[in-house]
Amino acid sequence: MGLETEKADVQLFMDDDSYSHHSCVDYADPEKFADSGRDRDPNRLNSNLQVGFEDVIAEPESTHSFDKVWICSHALFEISKYVIYKFLTVFLAIPLAFAAGIIFATLSCLHIWIIMPFVKTCLMVLPSVQTIWRSVTDAVIAPLCTSVGRVFSSVSLQLSRD
């Protein structure tokens, strides 16, 4: 409830000349916040996700707002995106990761212990079923269809106008 005496860890640098090329938050001390250099999306699952200011908000040449409005809008967009994303990940990332882990573990278990043994069993039994089905077809269904075909082959229709 007074004046803040601590130095801020995050600063946003926006120049009049380079505001349109700037799309992320610059840290005051990059080494302090640096990740271990590991790519967090090595399989490019979210490569289609475009959340930069220029990807979301654009003004055509014919309609431009004031430069200061554009700069402030850009800064507020980046700050709010940064803060809200961090806030949401603090509260949602761990529970959602836990739920996704449970779902994928359950699906993996079902696939490994139920679905694949069932499929393999069906594939093992199918040649026998195919042989039995062919025998039933040849012994029962083929003679029945042949008899029905012979009965209907002797039917003749004559149309006449009276």
Swiss-Prot record:
Membrane topology: Peripheral membrane protein
Post-translational modification note: Phosphorylated on serine and tyrosine residues. CAV1 promotes phosphorylation on Ser-23 which then targets the complex to the plasma membrane, lipid rafts and caveolae. Phosphorylation on Ser-36 appears to modulate mitosis in endothelial cells. Phosphorylation on both Tyr-19 and Tyr-27 is required for insulin-induced 'Ser-727' phosphorylation of STAT3 and its activation. Phosphorylation on Tyr-19 is required for insulin-induced phosphorylation of MAPK1 and DNA binding of STAT3. Tyrosine phosphorylation is induced by both EGF and insulin (By. similarity).
Source species, domain of life: Eukaryota
InterPro entries per record: Caveolin, Caveolin_CS
Alphabetically ordered keywords of this record: Cell membrane, Cytoplasm, Golgi apparatus, Membrane, Nucleus, Phosphoprotein
Position of the signal peptide: none
Cellular compartments annotated: Nucleus; Cytoplasm; Golgi apparatus membrane; Cell membrane
One matching Pfam family: Caveolin
Keyword Signal: no
GO CC terms of this entry: caveola; cytoplasmic vesicle; focal adhesion; Golgi membrane; nucleus; perinuclear region of cytoplasm; plasma membrane raft; sarcolemma
Residues with PTM Phosphoserine: 20, 23, 36
Intramembrane residue numbers: 87-107
Chain positions found as Phosphotyrosine: 19, 27
A molecular function GO annotation: molecular adaptor activity
Residues in the Cytoplasmic compartment per record: 1-86, 108-162
GO biological process: caveola assembly; endoplasmic reticulum organization; insulin receptor signaling pathway; mitochondrion organization; negative regulation of endothelial cell proliferation; positive regulation of dopamine receptor signaling pathway; regulation of cytosolic calcium ion concentration; skeletal muscle fiber development
Job of this protein: May act as a scaffolding protein within caveolar membranes. Interacts directly with G-protein alpha subunits and can functionally regulate their activity. Acts as an accessory protein in conjunction with CAV1 in targeting to lipid rafts and driving caveolae formation. The Ser-36 phosphorylated form has a role in modulating mitosis in endothelial cells. Positive regulator of cellular mitogenesis of the MAPK signaling pathway. Required for the insulin-stimulated nuclear translocation and activation of MAPK1 and STAT3, and the subsequent regulation of cell cycle progression.
PANTHER family cross-referenced by the UniProt entry: CAVEOLIN, CAVEOLIN-2
Subunit structure: Monomer or homodimer. Interacts with CAV1; the interaction forms a stable heterooligomeric complex that is required for targeting to lipid rafts and for caveolae formation. Tyrosine phosphorylated forms do not form heterooligomers with the Tyr-19-phosphorylated form existing as a monomer or dimer, and the Tyr-27-form as a monomer only. Interacts (tyrosine phosphorylated form) with the SH2 domain-containing proteins, RASA1, NCK1 and SRC. Interacts (tyrosine phosphorylated form) with INSR, the interaction (Tyr-27-phosphorylated form) is increased on insulin stimulation.
Protein family: Belongs to the caveolin family.
Protein name per its UniProtKB record: Caveolin-2
